[in-house]
A protein has these predicted regions:
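Bacterial N-terminal signal peptides that target proteins for export
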Residues: 1-8
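Mature extracytoplasmic/lumenal regions of exported proteins
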Residues: 166-168, 178, 182-185, 196-198, ...
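Cysteine/selenocysteine-centered motifs that mediate thiol-based redox chemistry or coordinate metal-sulfur cofactors
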Residues: 201, 206-232
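Short, ordered coil/turn segments that flank beta-strands lining enzyme active or ligand-binding pockets
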Residues: 56, 172-173, 203-204
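Bacterial N-terminal signal peptides
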Residues: 8-16
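Extended soluble regions of mature proteins
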Residues: 171-181, 207-213
Length: 246
């Protein structure tokens, strides 16, 4: 075989191998770790939540901004302090702190009931870890310097609850995940439509979700509401060595 033909064949094989690794295993491993990194991270951070709820046409708009100081740990994230809370332009920090204290007391008395409520919830299953095999990926063109792939459930898993379809972007050189958008294949009860965007960043050896944006429409019967919720993580203060990301 001529050298030029051999070179072309080698390149073709390399491209085929690369295509079969979209997204790269390293990216998916870091995505899985980053999605839950702060839940058990031994440190504190600030969580700011901005929410806008309105009728589908935008009327009866209700806005709120809550800033909380959080900690991670073996039992999961915990609210240590409500720094501030604004609802409809009014400072309701004192009321929010009172509600938090009431919830803590109720949780201490009815932990089993709370767990039952959590078990009834259906989350959004994203690619990563053991869930990766449930998804099929399609490579996307590089955009703004980021490699990407679209994902959707494989046919044999299409009817499983909680699965999503969407797009994942990662840094082409470092393979760090940058952002992901997803929407449920089948919407949860009471939700007509919903999309999620997660943005990840690296600090030292740890990758974590720094920002999320959730948009959707939900409700019951003839009562429908449009919702837009943003969360941002800031002011990370490790209590010890930061958790490493693969």
């Amino acid at each position: 075989m001529p050298a030029r033909g051999l070179l072309s064949l080698t390149i073709a094989v390399a491209v085929t191998a690369l295509a079969s690794e979209v997204p790269p295993p390293e990216t998916l491993a870091r995505l899985e770790a980053g999605a839950t990194a702060l839940e058990t991270w031994p440190g504190a951070f600030t969580l700011t939540t901005r929410a806008v709820i309105s009728k589908p046409d935008g009327d009866d708009r209700e806005e709120s901004v809550t800033v909380m100081r959080m900690t991670g740990g073996p039992a999961g994230p915990e609210v240590k302090e409500i720094v501030s809370a604004i609802r409809g332009g009014k400072d309701v920090t004192a009321e929010a702190r009172g509600e938090l204290e009431k919830e803590r007391k109720q949780a201490a008395k009815g932990a089993d009931e709370e767990k039952k409520d959590e078990d009834d919830e259906v989350g959004m299953t994203l690619p990563g870890g053991k869930q990766t095999g449930k998804f099929a990926f399609t490579a996307l063109p590089v955009a703004d310097g980021a490699c990407g792939a679209a994902f959707a459930p494989r046919a044999e898993h299409a009817k499983e609850p909680g699965l999503t379809t969407g797009e994942l972007r990662w840094e082409c050189t470092t393979l760090d995940p940058l952002w992901l958008t997803a929407r449920p294949v089948k919407n949860p009860k009471g939700v007509k439509e919903m999309t999620l965007r997660m943005e990840l960043v690296r600090t030292g050896e740890m990758i974590y979700v720094a920002r999320t944006v959730t948009d959707g429409v939900g409700g019951v019967l003839f009562i429908k509401r449009k919702f837009h919720v943003e969360t941002e993580i800031a002011e990370l203060a490790p209590a010890g060595p930061a958790a490493a990301t693969p």
